[in-house]
């Protein structure tokens, strides 16, 4: 069964057509790539899938039902290309804040963050500020905060940007693990 189904999506900005009649099915547990040149509409399409934008025409089905951005947003993990981390905030506090925004209790969030931080060798980072991280370290933090609430759909926009080969492999391995455990993953 398709976790995500897009039917004839169109999006305009004034007279500019950003997305033109896109239809696709992404199955549960599938890893799916959105490919296209700059300006092809990939980011606009992602923003419609996440409920940031609404399509002007067409429909989005999520888990067999009409997509409801309010109800379904907690089932989606989105790591945008432009990172949204608060530079002055401590890493542990930021991860807790983002986890609780996604509906995790304090104790549940703390437990999951500790597990992911250990897995990514970030245990000692808890009290560091985001502004003190390299681009690759920030990328690891952003990945962790995207997946720690165990979303059904994970959307990753350039997830390997700024990572060295070792950390690229670590993220890649985790993406495959998440897929094997049933998460659906979309790359752009």
Region annotations inferred by a language model:
Residues 50:
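Helix-to-loop junction immediately C-terminal to a conserved catalytic motif
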Residues 169-181:
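Helical segment within the ABC ATPase nucleotide-binding domain
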Residues 96, 100, 108-125:
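Conserved ABC ATPase "signature" region
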Residues 165-167:
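Helix N-cap at the start of a conserved alpha-helix in ABC-type nucleotide-binding domains
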Residues 154-158:
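Catalytic Walker B motif of ABC-type/P-loop ATPase nucleotide-binding domains
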Residues 58-74:
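Conserved ABC transporter NBD signature motif
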């Amino acid at each position: 069964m398709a976790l995500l189904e897009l039917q004839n999506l169109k999006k305009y900005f004034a007279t500019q057509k950003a997305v033109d009649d896109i239809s696709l099915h992404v199955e549960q547990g599938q890893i799916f790539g959105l490919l296209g040149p700059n300006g092809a509409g990939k980011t606009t399409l992602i923003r419609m899938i996440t409920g940031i934008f609404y399509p002007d025409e067409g429909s989005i089905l999520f888990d067999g039902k009409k997509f409801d951005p309010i109800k379904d947003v907690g089932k989606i993990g989105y790591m945008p290309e432009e990172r949204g981390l608060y530079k002055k905030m401590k890493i542990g506090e930021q991860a807790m804040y983002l986890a609780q925004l996604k509906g995790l209790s304090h104790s549940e969030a703390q437990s999951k963050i500790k597990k992911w931080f250990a897995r990514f060798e970030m245990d000692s980072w808890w009290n560091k500020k985001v502004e003190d991280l390299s681009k690759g370290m920030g990328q690891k933090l952003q990945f962790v905060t995207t997946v720690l609430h165990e979303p059904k759909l994970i959307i990753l926009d350039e997830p390997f940007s700024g990572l060295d080969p070792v950390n690229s492999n670590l993220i890649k391995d985790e993406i495959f693990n998440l897929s094997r455990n049933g998460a659906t993953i979309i790359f752009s």
